A protein has these predicted regions:
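Glycine-rich beta-alpha loop elements in corrinoid/cobalamin-binding modules
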Residues: 11, 37, 56-250, 258
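Conserved SAM/AdoMet-binding glycine-rich loop
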Residues: 24, 59-60, 338-486, 490-494
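Terminal amphipathic helices with adjacent charged low-complexity linkers/tails
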Residues: 61, 190-239, 252, 261-264, ...
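Flexible glycine/acidic-rich beta-alpha junction loops that bind and position SAM and/or redox cofactors
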Residues: 84-93, 141-143, 173-178, 202-208, ...
Length: 633
């Protein structure tokens, strides 16, 4: 027996159970840590007296693994894992990934494409009448008809595609608690239609009254304006106070999204984090080297949920929501003490964060009664006048953590919302952040420098980041430290023409930055930016949006972020010419790339081939700090 939930029939029998209440199927390896949704849901059910068996990464080629525990008494629960299975498998260029951080040994290929659909179909093959509920990120973000980047088409709701009975969206503690109770009372899953934070399919004549009717699946497939309209309608109803039921017809069925679940209270969130997690992968993976995904979170603490930053390319607003829920100081310190007792703890708490590390308060006072503003952002392009800005509680917690026995340092590695820092008139937190909580590098996310692109991203304008950067280095210098900002930057986001991409190159040049890794925009399911990518429309204004889509242009935009690399030279030359920025081609200090040079043999054949050139060029200007120190991990 281990202290993990049973993963074999023998382990289940050793608990005195022959038929589990639930079989939980996940596309990830089994890691019993609160950063993994599977751990939270299974431990929560266990705490409520239910028996749960875990089926992690089953072999989907036959039904054998799906019958390992027999048919559960109440339901199968299915998730694709911590991230969408297609994102786990493919890069933004649609190339197959060679590793999977959520699989044993980092091995790729242990989950199928579209894992939720595949797993549900295998369950139906084995047990046609079994109750199936789906949840997690893959199900949550695909709950409506959605553009699928990998198929380059609009797919129906994953609820219709998978054949499951119920879909739980968002953070699922309330939903699974209510569902388990109703199932235990003998209510058939097909009759469970009133749980907040769930979706179900019904006949059109049984559609609940008063819902917001989106354009149907057939409409959004053929009409991009209808798709954009549906996206806005769906986003506008995601607040737990103001959100209404959302309807979208799929053929002869009506998809019904009930209003969002109510956020956990602080007491409820604390209780979730008190569950008896082992904080590590199941020992069955030890021989394969464990599960790499645990490394980033093993000595980290999540202190909040939700994000009112509301970036258009981010899925958090549609999954966790815009409301901030925070754990108590006592809960955070309790987890930190557990971390310090782990045998491989070296004295360093790696991160104290969440979707956004430095949010502890609601964005404003009105939202408790009136809900979040519809169609508006709290921080972009400028902070709302009603925004509450206060880092004092977060700072107090960090100070308490630093004083714990065995703790040498407490870091905040990422997730700092720099515009929120700059909105704070008291810079005590900023100074202490730089003095105590930066491990040489602080990762922040300006994402771009063009305000045209930043507006499409839903991010603050670049002037805010520049002010933050200036102040960061002033404080760093005053402390006698050598610390650096590592900016996350994104190429090819909707709105980014080649001209806007060149502006990003010039920013990197002027700041002496040589990013070793860059990120192309990835059109993941359900986001506003993905809607822009597919429709070439802004769903909030219905105005056209320029979208770089061809592999050539996306490669050029990516190359401009690493213009100094010899292998990018030809792409950079092409990009600058197409952008009308030949002034940046040359050997002067302000140029990005040297002009094409002809060899002696090529000169003799110039009339025959005017375009022949070598791959020569000048070395990039020495950066203000080395690329090693600016490595993005």
């Amino acid at each position: 027996m281990t202290n993990f939930l049973p993963v074999t029939m023998q382990e289940l029998l050793e608990t005195g159970v022959s038929q589990p209440d639930f079989v939980y199927i996940t596309g990830d390896a089994y890691v019993d840590h609160p950063s993994f949704g599977a751990a939270i849901i299974t431990r929560l059910l266990q705490s409520q007296g239910y028996s749960v068996a875990v089926l992690a990464q089953p072999d989907w080629h036959t039904v054998k693994d799906f019958t390992r525990f027999g048919k559960p008494r109440l339901a199968f629960l299915v998730t694709g894992g911590n991230i969408d299975s297609m994102v786990a498998h493919y890069t933004s260029a649609k190339r197959k990934r060679s590793t999977d951080m959520y699989s044993p040994g980092g091995r790729a290929g242990l989950r199928p494409d579209r894992a939720v659909i595949t797993y549900c179909r295998k369950i139906r093959e084995a047990y046609p009448d079994a109750a199936i509920a789906i949840g997690g990120l893959e199900a949550s973000l695909r709950r409506f008809a959605h553009y699928d980047y990998w198929d380059d088409t609009v797919r129906p709701s994953i609820l219709a595609d998978s054949g499951a009975d119920l879909l739980m969206y968002g953070m699922g503690e309330h939903q699974i608690t209510e569902l388990a109770q109703l199932l235990a009372e003998g209510v058939p899953i097909q009759e469970i239609t009133d749980i907040r934070g769930t979706c179900y399919l019904t006949s059109p004549e049984n559609t609940p009254w008063g819902g917001v009717q989106c354009p149907d699946y057939a409409q959004v497939c053929r009409d991009k304006k209808a798709y954009a309209k549906a996206t806005r309608q769906q986003y506008d109803q995601q607040d737990e106070i103001t959100g209404k039921t959302v309807l979208q017809r799929h053929g002869d069925k009506m998809l019904v999204q009930n209003p969002p679940a109510v956020s956990l209270t602080q007491e409820e969130l604390d209780a979730v984090y008190r569950l008896p997690y082992q904080r590590k992968p199941h020992p069955m993976y030890d021989a394969q080297g464990g599960v790499p995904g645990i490394e980033e979170v093993q000595f980290s603490i999540a202190h909040n949920r939700g994000c009112f930053g509301y970036c258009n390319f981010c899925s958090i607003a549609l999954h966790q929501g815009r409301r901030i829920t925070c754990r108590s100081e006592e809960s955070i310190l309790e987890e930190a003490k557990k971390i310090t007792e782990m045998p491989n703890f070296k004295g360093y708490i790696h991160d104290v964060g969440g979707p956004t590390a430095n949010f502890r308060l609601p964005s404003c006072k009105k939202q408790a009664k009136s809900g979040m503003c519809v169609g508006k952002k709290c921080l972009a392009p400028e902070p709302c006048k009603a925004l509450q800005v206060d880092h004092s509680e977060y700072l107090h917690i960090l100070r308490k953590l630093r004083k714990l026995p065995k703790v040498k340092r407490v870091f905040i590695r990422s997730g700092i919302r720099f515009d929120y820092v700059m909105a704070d008139k008291d810079d005590t937190f900023f100074k202490e952040l730089v003095a105590e909580h930066v491990s040489g590098q602080l990762k922040v996310a300006p994402e771009h420098v063009s305000n045209v692109v930043l507006d499409k991203m839903g991010k603050p304008h670049i002037e805010c980041y520049e002010a933050f950067q200036k102040r960061f280095y002033e404080i760093t210098k005053s402390l006698g430290k050598k610390q650096y900002l590592v900016p996350y930057l994104m190429s090819s986001h909707p709105g980014s023409t080649l001209q806007e991409a060149v502006k990003l190159s010039l920013f990197l040049r002027d700041n002496g930055m040589h990013p070793e890794q860059v990120q192309d925009f990835y059109p993941t399911p359900g986001t506003i930016s993905t809607c822009m990518y597919y429709t070439e429309l802004d769903p909030y204004t219905m105005e056209p949006v320029y979208v770089p889509k061809t592999p050539k242009e996306k490669a050029m935009q990516r190359a401009l972020l690493q213009y100094y690399l010899p292998q990018n030279r030809q792409l950079v030359l092409s990009a600058l010419k197409q952008a009308g920025r030949q002034d940046l081609i040359g050997t002067k200090p302000n140029c990005l790339v040297a002009p094409e040079q002809r060899s002696d043999s090529q000169r003799s054949h110039a009339d025959k081939n005017r375009n022949s050139h070598t791959k020569g060029g000048v070395s990039p200007r020495k950066p203000k700090h080395s690329s090693k120190k600016s490595r993005r991990s």
